[in-house]
Amino acid sequence: MEKWYVAAKKADFDKWAKEFHISPVTARILRNRDLTEESQIRKFLYGKLEDCYSPWLLKDMDRAVEEILKAVKEGLHIRVIGDYDVDGICSSYILTKGFQMLGAQVDTAIPHRIHDGYGLNEHLIEEAKREGVGMIVTCDNGIAAAPQIELANSLGMRVVVTDHHEVPYIEENGERKEQLPPALAVVDPKRSDCSYPFQGICGGVVALKVIQAITEKTGNPGLINIQDELLEFAALSTVCDVMELKDENRILVKEGLKRIQKGYNEGLKALMEVNEIAPDRLSAYHLGFVLGPCLNATGRLDTAKRALELLQSFTRADAMTAARELKDLNESRKNLTVQGIQRADTYIQEHHMTEDKVMVIYLPEVHESIAGIIAGKVREKYHHPVFILTKGEDGVKGSGRSIEAYHMYDAMTQVKQFFTKYGGHKLAAGLSMREEDIEPLRTALNEKCTLMEDDFIPRVHIDVAMPMGYADDALAGELALLEPFGTGNPKPLFAQKDLIFQAGFKMGANKTCAKFRVKTPEGNTQTLVFFGDLERLGAFLNEKYGIGSEEALYAGRGSFPLSVVYQVGQNTYKGRTEVQYIMQNYC
């Protein structure tokens, strides 16, 4: 079960409420998002694109712009090399489109997940040389590709790196010494010598900053005209790469959603249409859980070039055809994922892995492209750091997903002798290794792991404990000011004790969600909606109140007190909008 915590951060909530014309409840939520200054609150609630940081604050941006413009002027063949996930695809689109506006001779190469693996490799470098490429510009990769960039240099090609991943390092006398690749410019906010105010931007935003800097430098009208469209892809990258929706990320996603709604890009418009997303209902949720997975599916089960082709579609007909194919591909990916999760559960039980602090699960028959998704689902269920390893064409490949208390990239660096290649950040990573090293890796990771039992218990952070009736139409509407929600800015959570569950009604085509009639301690009757695991809820009721309790509840004969964590939303049906209370947790 989880541990519930009610936030108790202090501030003058009445003053904030008066200053920003919000309720004290909303003011308290803002404080729970670690905002302390009025300037921070103003930026959070009403931030505009002008509040984002100058691209020139990124280390090496001046050199990157100079080298790219020089290559364009000299007529060099420029190749953008990205990655096969959404961030890599969108980053590639941003840079390629921007360079095209400059009149550059430019094309794009996206590594094949299985044949090439992540990022730059010798094959891509040698292929670029054969095809007359004079400059390589990386996006969403490159920071850990020193040997490959050395090869490119030796072959007479120029390289500019744009990335956002952790910089590789070695330990010398107890100090970290960064190992930057030998490129003409290395633009990465995670460089220790980079003074950019916010490190948490994705590859797509770094790419956008490069194009913004070139636009400022040149005043190119074509670049000025595509800024709105490029912002769409920076927003999509940010959400799909699970960046925290704080600081300028929040502004970029908020403004990017507005641009996507206007439909600047035929490919995104088509993808929304085939997924039946109304533009006026678009949210960060749709980016991360509907549109993003369709783009990601190409890199998982086919080639990510298909996603890039969708985004580069010129006609609606071409875009619709490509969008339908991507949607079908994503359905196939979902089916494979369900099977993979079942296999992971079986492996955990058979290998008594619940005793391990770090779970290293080898599923040779699972498609390597869905290892990360499976790792995320297993992490959610067991709340342990998880590595899912699969058998690739050349050794073992895998993905890791972590919990907040465990810095995965640092932990991997401590045992890097087991990897032929690895990279990532605090909460996610990718790797390649030899099959014979799997068990030694599992042993080493667990021996070095300092996590305590308390770290494995999920925490539920409640913003405000208050009666459901306090969350009226006005508050529900006001909470929309806090959108977009996502990593780093979760939907606000409220809690109330001793709600009496009186009746329940299952809903949906497969009866997988439910509505409950509850009576509050104040004597009011309210309706709670639940989209969680109904089977688990039923088992909980039967255990707590006796066999038959679940049946009694759905028969309208319930009288079961529960404490509940809930969210407040708005539901519109047949033109009528009303407050909706959504149960998240119970005990």
Model-predicted segments: where are they?
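Residue-level marker for buried hydrophobic side chains located in beta-strands
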Residues: 80, 137, 160-161, 238, ...
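Active-site cavity-forming subdomains of large catalytic enzyme subunits
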Residues: 126-204, 208-220, 225, 229
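Hydrophobic helix-and-loop "lid/oligomerization" segment in the mid-to-C-terminal part
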Residues: 7-134, 155, 173-176, 182, ...
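Histidine-centered active-site/metal-ligand motif
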Residues: 164-165, 367, 425, 513
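Mid-to-C-terminal polyanion-binding domains and interfaces
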Residues: 70-77, 318-324, 328-362, 414-587
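Non-catalytic interface/linker regions that flank or bridge core catalytic/transmembrane domains
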Residues: 3-5
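A residue-level signal for conserved active-site and pocket-lining positions in enzyme catalytic cores
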Residues: 30, 137, 296, 479, ...
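A short acidic, amphipathic alpha-helical/loop segment
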Residues: 147-151, 359, 374, 478
